[in-house]
Amino acid sequence: LLKVLIHVCHSRNEDHTYTTTAPSSGGRRFHVNCLKRDFRLILTGEKWLDELVDRYAGNRGGGGSIDLVMHLIGINFVQAVRVCLEAAE
């Protein structure tokens, strides 16, 4: 997920003050800007959650890089796969 953030987001800063309720999960919080939109993401392994989206919204989080790219830049599945492949190069 970090490779994708680096590839698609203009700015990203890790919040080193963030502490998770389950330290063994390895969750990390990032403040990112992508296409002039702000996101506050928690990344835990291959899962992610956008804290700035209403908790009852259906698109608040997901699993994997493709879902993350679709959320960050608002593109469809096929386009997101291409972006992820570019990020992996």
Where are these regions (language model features)?
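N-terminal structured subdomain of primase-like DNA metabolism proteins
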Residues: 1-89
